[in-house]
Design a protein with these regions (language model features):
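Conserved FAD-binding catalytic core of PHBH/FMO-like flavoproteins
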Residues: 1-108
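Short amphipathic alpha-helical/adjacent loop interface patches that line ligand
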Residues: 9, 27, 148-151, 180, ...
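A generic short alpha-helical patch detector that favors 3-5-residue windows
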Residues: 22, 121, 146, 182-186
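Gly/Ser/Thr-rich helix-start
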Residues: 8, 18, 53, 131, ...
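FAD/FMN-dependent oxidoreductases across multiple families
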Residues: 77-168
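Residue-level signal for pocket-adjacent positions within structured domains
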Residues: 7, 15, 29, 40-43, ...
Length: 239
């Protein structure tokens, strides 16, 4: 079998003639390399602001992290022209009290945000995985987490097939797709909803949003249920 995990511009997907539905956005994601004042201890942080969504992800080096800042194209055009000191100042103002202080920042790249979905996930014994199959809003690392669950599920099926001396054929791959599709659809819906909820700037909306977040925090069953869905523990999960 062929597992195609070659990214959003997948050459394998093109060679397989799998159509892709794309939803273009007026948003841009910018990636920065940040240096923290103290080690990150493998923690990640995300903030939703009026200037967009900012996610900080730990890297291998103890004090190095990546910042992915998703915002409107108009704002991004201004931000890329800032001096490094301005990036540091803005990130520290957004994350004050939530994560270690940023001492330096360097812009790595920027790219337009596109939401895409392949019309099918497999052709025969060829399987599309990760961004080759779908891309969506970069919210709470859900795309990465989903890909890890997909890989774990595929590995489980392949191990079971070998143990049972079963052929690794199109039928087995179809079983994988049927298993994983509900989780994939759920994550796409959740990330789209979160982007809408935190992106709207209507009068009074921030108050309603705050009340909703307070309800999640206070109502006993809401927070665990939401966490289960975001962590991928709802429905059938890989062993």
């Amino acid at each position: 079998m062929l597992v195609a995990a070659d990214g959003a511009g997948s050459v394998c997907r093109q060679l397989l003639s799998v159509p892709v539905t794309q939803q273009h956005s007026d948003e841009v994601s910018m990636a920065f390399c940040l240096t923290l004042s103290v080690p990150h201890q493998q923690r990640a942080w995300q903030r939703f602001t009026q200037q967009g969504t900012l996610a900080i992800l730990p890297m291998r080096e103890a004090n190095q992290v990546r910042l992915v800042w998703t915002c409107s194209a108009a704002l991004a055009q201004d931000v890329v022209g800032w001096q490094p000191e301005q990036w540091v100042q803005h990130v520290n103002s957004v994350y004050r009290g939530y994560c270690p202080a940023v001492v330096s920042a360097r812009l790595l790249q920027q790219f337009p945000l596109r939401i895409s979905q392949a019309s099918r996930q497999h052709v025969g014994r060829c399987l599309l995985m990760g961004n080759a199959a779908r891309t969506f809003y970069p919210t709470t690392a859900q795309g990465f987490n989903l890909a890890l669950r997909d890989v774990a599920a595929l590995a489980q099926l392949l191990v079971q097939a070998k143990q049972n001396q079963r052929a690794i054929d199109a039928t087995l791959i179809a079983e994988f797709v049927a298993w994983r599709q509900p989780d994939q659809t759920r994550v796409m819906q959740i990330t789209a909803a979160m982007n809408t909820v935190f992106g709207l700037q209507l009068p009074g909306w921030s108050v309603l949003r705050g009340l909703g977040l307070s309800a999640v925090e206070l109502v006993p069953f809401l927070k665990p249920r939401l966490a289960q869905r975001l962590l991928g523990y709802s429905g059938r999960v890989p062993d």
